[in-house]
């Protein structure tokens, strides 16, 4: 409601501890065929609007993991140390399991593509790209359930301060990513 996702198909994602994606389905409580949940988006005296809901369990918590490992001092340092390319380093940020659409609490994170040339900048880039990839996968699931592509994504939350993450998100989605103040 706060990001003005009033039309059917409007989508938003909050990048906090996790990443939480919602897409307006209008006045119809649409049931997902692909592992998403259905929620009430808002209710007024005049109407009830519904949304599809999907989650990525580890977003800012994956960044906190980088600080716990001593690879960055804080989330604010990410963009300053990130490498221009991951050089093949890949990260699946399932540090707390996988949420929608897999629902696998037993899933573990995966880091691959490391070499002696890998730096902390490559690891930071891989974590950010891994978060963006999970959100992009969710958007594909949303589009399948909605029967139409989602044309833009409105975002908020602490991680939206990372220009690198937001650019990775836009690149993977190939739609505008509109950052709302957090």
Region spans (language model):
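Active-site core segments that coordinate phosphate-bearing ligands/cofactors
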Residues: 1-182
